[in-house]
Amino acid sequence: MYTEEDGYLYNKEKVKEKVIETIDNCIKLKLYVIIDWHILSDNNPNIHKQEAIEFFDDISKIYGKNNNVIYEICNEPNGDDVRWKSSVYPYAKDVIEVIRKNSPDSIIIVGTPDWCKSILEVIGNQLPYKNIMYAFHFYSGTHGELYRKSLEYAIENGVPVFVSEWGTSTAENGTSIFEEESDKWVEFLNNKGISWVNWSFSNKDEATSILKKETKTLNDENLTKSGLYVKKKIQEKLLTTNK
């Protein structure tokens, strides 16, 4: 759920109704659902902290006992002056306090600076709550071995990681996907036991969209090259998990 970009802040009740509808459908289907406070152009999560507190208070009151509901409280903090200790940590602490009153044990994902790349800033500065995870994002055509080493170092130093967004293209989204580099990333994540979510379940004219633009039904014919790739990776993981 975008905060700006014509999102929640511009039509709170309508957008919240759509979020609730989506969550309810996921619960019926016995799926995990991540409620994503998707900041982007607003850069610093503190700009709309009060609105985030109100939103997550409302939503966690409804779904506080649903263990398949995950709260992601600030997608991709960004901007040179938006750092973990000075900006994201104090924001997260205030929002988590509200969620924990309604949902003591739910998983909460917290974004990290530089569009969820600077996860090393979390080392030694984790939030004082249980079931907190820290977001890391990448795009296979842009972020390679150096980023995997950074992520591995964070894990080795006790940072619980959730890759809540990754794409098969470049960070600029481009027109091509990078299967070989994506293979390296997926193998790395699976070997480390890191959960991941692919961007994105949409039919936008972007390389990372899994659906073709004129899609009306969900079948392989309507999946993009990226969609077919991601479906294959999910199926491979399921086969491994269910052995």
Task: Give the role of each language-model region.
Residues 1-28:
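Active-site-adjacent substrate/metal-binding segments within catalytic domains
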Residues 39:
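Short glycine/proline-centered loop/turn elements that form peptide/ligand docking sites
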Residues 32, 49-70, 74-204, 208-240:
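Extracellular glycoside hydrolase catalytic/binding regions
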Residues 243:
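Extracellular carbohydrate-recognition regions
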Residues 2-4, 42, 69, 78:
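Localized chelating/binding microdomains
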Residues 45:
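Short acidic-hydrophobic catalytic motif
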